[in-house]
């Protein structure tokens, strides 16, 4: 009986070596739990009920692969125990086990279910958990966390069949519009063409109505005994409004009507002009009969003299007015020049006063007039000569010895 030092491998010290009573802790990245804490099995959670479904207290009975007799599956905690597949402690297989596998084992390895109904090991269903799966699930390798395509408890929602007659036919890309197509390639152009076609139909209808109205008016005018003067009678109010609206609408629709007058009006105006010309001719003839030739000549001479006198007077008045205007303009110009000169003088005086005030301010700031030489700033004459004669400054002269405290002293700025 061998003693194992690792209590995890053999907690009861049964001497089982690696196949001890406690299963090995796997190298998983799941949460490590403390001793005595309950184990929450990680069930695959996907679908709509994953957020609300609490973890099960007891493992659900797994589905078997078929209706024949099966011993219950081993629980997940007994997978690695030394109790073998059919109860009893684990023992190594017999020596004759190392023969090539029979047909039943080959079938089991490659995923086919053997069909013998005895209680041997080949009948206990597939050992690979990927083979035994509840109905309604589809195994997809490599898609574990992405959820099912269809939830198992939800029936497939059958969409109603699409009515293809309501859909547009496919667009004909190459030729003209096919007879079955609802719209052409350029739908906007098609809509605009429809609009223009409607407008043309409307104009055609209006023209027909206008022709009908003209025929009715002609029939009415021929039927009435007054003839041309019958048109001058004003119609009643409602008819007048309707006619006004019709004429306005026709002007909007056909702008050429704006510049061409109505044919009935043309006839009326032509007849009225002829009547007026005849009356004027009669008046002139009467005037000529009334006045004799001599009187007419005297009247003509008098009228010529009066015209000449009035022209001479007008010319004199114009000349006098032009002279008065020129004199007035000259006087205004002189007055404007005098006013401008006075304004310029006042501006110059003000600028001079401002300049004097600024000069006084600068003198107060500098305390020095501009004429004073700057030579006195250098110092006395002896010092100046010494300064000019000294070609090179020695380092002792250039950097005088001053106490360190004086160098770092900061004078009071506020004084």
From Swiss-Prot:
It is found in: Nucleus. It comes from Bos taurus. Keywords: Coiled coil, Differentiation, Nucleus, Spermatogenesis. Residues 31-46, 135-156 have a biased composition (Basic residues). Its main location: nucleus. Residues 1-11 have a biased composition (Basic and acidic residues). Residues 275-363 have a biased composition (Acidic residues). One of its GO terms (biological process) is sperm DNA condensation. Regulator of histone epigenetic modifications and chromatin compaction into the sperm head, required for histone-to-protamine (HTP) transition. HTP is a key event in which somatic histones are first replaced by testis-specific histone variants, then transition proteins (TNPs) are incorporated into the spermatid nucleus, and finally protamines (PRMs) replace the TNPs to promote chromatin condensation. GO terms for cellular component: nucleus. This is Coiled-coil domain-containing glutamate-rich protein 1. Residues 1-20, 29-64, 133-162, 202-241, 255-372 are annotated as: Disordered. Pfam families: CCER1. InterPro entries: CCER1, Coiled-coil_domain. Residues 211-220 have a biased composition (Low complexity). It comes from the Eukaryota.
């Amino acid at each position: 009986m061998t003693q194992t030092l690792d209590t995890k491998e053999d907690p009861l010290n049964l001497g089982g070596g690696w196949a001890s009573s406690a299963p090995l802790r796997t190298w998983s990245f799941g949460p490590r739990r403390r001793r005595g804490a309950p184990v929450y099995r990680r069930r695959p959670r996907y679908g709509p009920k994953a957020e609300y479904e609490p973890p099960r207290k007891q493992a659900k009975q797994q589905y078997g692969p078929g209706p024949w007799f099966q011993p219950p599956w081993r629980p997940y905690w007994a997978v690695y125990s030394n109790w073998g597949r059919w109860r009893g402690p684990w023992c190594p297989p017999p020596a004759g086990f190392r023969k090539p596998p029979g047909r039943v084992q080959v079938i089991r390895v490659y995923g086919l279910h053997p069909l013998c109904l005895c209680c041997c090991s080949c009948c206990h269903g597939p050992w690979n958990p990927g083979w035994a799966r509840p109905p309604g699930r589809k195994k997809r390798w490599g898609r574990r966390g992405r959820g099912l395509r269809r939830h198992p408890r939800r029936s497939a929602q059958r969409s109603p069949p699409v009515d293809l007659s309501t859909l547009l036919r496919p667009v004909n890309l190459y030729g003209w519009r096919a007879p079955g197509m609802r719209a052409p390639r350029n739908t906007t152009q098609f809509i605009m063409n429809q609009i223009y076609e409607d407008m043309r139909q409307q104009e055609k209808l209006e023209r027909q109505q206008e022709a009908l109205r003209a025929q009715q008016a002609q029939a009415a005018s021929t039927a009435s005994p007054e003839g041309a003067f019958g048109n001058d009678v004003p119609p009643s109010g409602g008819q007048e409004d309707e006619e006004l609206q019709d004429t306005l609408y026709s002007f909007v629709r056909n702008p050429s009507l704006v510049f061409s007058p109505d044919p009935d009006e043309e006839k009326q105006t032509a007849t009225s002009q002829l009547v007026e010309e005849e009356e004027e001719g009669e008046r002139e003839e009467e005037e000529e009969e009334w006045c004799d030739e001599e009187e007419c000549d005297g009247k003509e001479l008098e009228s010529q003299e009066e015209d000449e006198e009035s022209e001479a007077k007008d010319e004199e008045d114009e000349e006098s007015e032009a002279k008065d205007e020129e004199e007035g303009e000259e006087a205004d110009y002189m007055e404007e020049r005098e006013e401008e000169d006075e304004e310029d003088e006042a501006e110059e005086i003000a600028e001079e006063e401002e300049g004097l005030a600024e000069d006084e301010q600068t003198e107060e700031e500098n305390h020095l007039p501009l004429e004073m030489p700057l030579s006195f700033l250098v110092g006395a004459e002896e010092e100046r000569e010494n300064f000019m004669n000294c070609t090179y400054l020695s380092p002792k002269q250039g950097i005088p010895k001053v106490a360190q405290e004086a160098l770092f002293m900061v004078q009071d700025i506020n004084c």
